[in-house]
From Swiss-Prot:
The active site is at residues 136, 140. Coiled coil: none annotated. Belongs to the glycosyl hydrolase 16 family. Residues 28-248 form the GH16 domain. The keyword Hydrolase applies. It catalyses: Hydrolysis of (1->4)-beta-D-glucosidic linkages in beta-D-glucans containing (1->3)- and (1->4)-bonds. Residues 267-334 form the Dockerin domain. SUPFAM superfamilies: Concanavalin A-like lectins/glucanases (SSF49899), Type I dockerin domain (SSF63446). GO terms for molecular function: licheninase activity. Pfam families: Dockerin_1, Glyco_hydro_16. It comes from Acetivibrio thermocellus. This is Beta-glucanase.
Length: 334
């Protein structure tokens, strides 16, 4: 009898432990990226990303619709608009990675939406939907005042770490880079390559997905202000980067604007400027992809040789890769 009681007690203990440990085991067993990751938003890559097609409920007064995540001129665009005949008055977009990411440096280049009652965001998240504890790290822009960025994080559903940073510019007027370095004992937040804040309490531990969304609030007027129903509103994103080893020392965060390389002789054509507008930017990248996919058979620029970025006498995917590396500042010039 004594042995049987002990056996029953041990079985009960193992069952309890399995309930406690299981969610954390699943987090560790998920696909966690541990190599550098760069996504330039020229098109929808369904192998790495997904468009949300559901509603979060709670304070989110919208339903996520894939139609509200679009791509144009080298940008991913989230659009908040009216929703007719549905359970929610508004529809908007959420874009999220399929893989999970852990400690490291995360960066986005984006332009926030401006309007009272809304939020534009860049964040990592995992939670009960992934069979994980709720861990999250946020960079959010409250549309009522886009001269500030709000930093926050959650560990096992516990937040309360909000910090409002004065940017010194309006995040809705132009593209800027925002990032954070997540480590076991701190989170450093960056704006345009400069570290602006460090958090050290209650740091999250569970790898999460990279996410971006745009949404109107409900029941949070004290925080966001009362949404006035204005539509459409858009937040725009150019790229996302992740470096597991932290901020790259030999590849600093991009500056707010992309400066095209200038030939020594101003009469020479500009390498990579395939649309002939005198600049090398995401528009050229989009045109280059259309050319390689045979959607177009010529570039708008007169001198087609500008597309031979690596000067090997061919126009192919190697040139496109080099152009991409230039746009994300992995190389200084073309």
């Amino acid at each position: 009898m004594k042995n049987r009681v002990i056996s029953l007690l041990m079985a009960s203990l193992l069952l309890v432990l399995s309930v406690i440990v299981a969610p954390f085991y699943k987090a560790e067993a998920a696909t966690v990226v541990n190599t550098p990751f760069v996504a330039v938003f020229s098109n929808f890559d369904s192998s790495q990303w997904e468009k949300a097609d559901w509603a979060n409920g709670s304070v989110f007064n919208c339903v996520w619709k894939p139609s509200q995540v679009t791509f144009s001129n080298g940008k991913m665009i989230l659009t908040l608009d009216r929703e007719y005949g549905g359970s929610y008055p508004y529809k908007s977009g959420e874009y999220r990675s399929k893989s999970f990411f852990g400690y490291g440096y995360y960066e986005v280049r984006m332009k926030a939406a401006k309007n009272v009652g809304i939020v534009s965001s860049f964040f990592t998240y995992t939670g009960p939907s992934d069979n994980n504890p709720w861990d999250e790290i946020d960079i959010e822009f409250l549309g009522k005042d886009t001269t500030k960025a709000q930093f926050n994080w959650y560990k096992n559903e516990v937040g309360g770490n909000e910090y409002l940073h004065n940017l010194g510019f309006d995040a809705s007027q132009d593209f800027h880079t925002y990032g954070f370095e997540w480590r076991p004992d701190y989170i450093d937040f960056y704006v345009d390559g400069k570290k602006v804040y460090r958090g050290t309490r209650n740091i999250p531990v569970t790898p999460g997905k990279i996410m971006m969304n745009l949404w109107p609030g409900k029941g949070v007027d004290e925080w966001l202000g009362r949404y006035d129903g204005r539509t459409p509103l858009q937040a725009e994103y150019e790229y996302v980067k992740y470096y597991p080893n932290g901020v790259p020392q030999d590849n600093p965060t991009p500056t707010p604007t992309i400066a095209p390389s200038t030939p020594t002789n101003p009469n020479l054509p500009l390498k990579g400027d395939v649309n002939g507008d005198g600049h090398v930017n995401s528009s050229d990248y989009s045109l280059f992809k259309r050319y390689l996919l045979r959607v177009i058979d010529r570039f708008p620029v007169g001198d087609q040789s500008v597309a031979d970025v690596n000067r090997d006498g061919r126009i192919d995917s190697t040139d496109l890769t080099m152009l991409k590396r230039y746009l994300i500042r992995a190389i200084p010039s073309l």
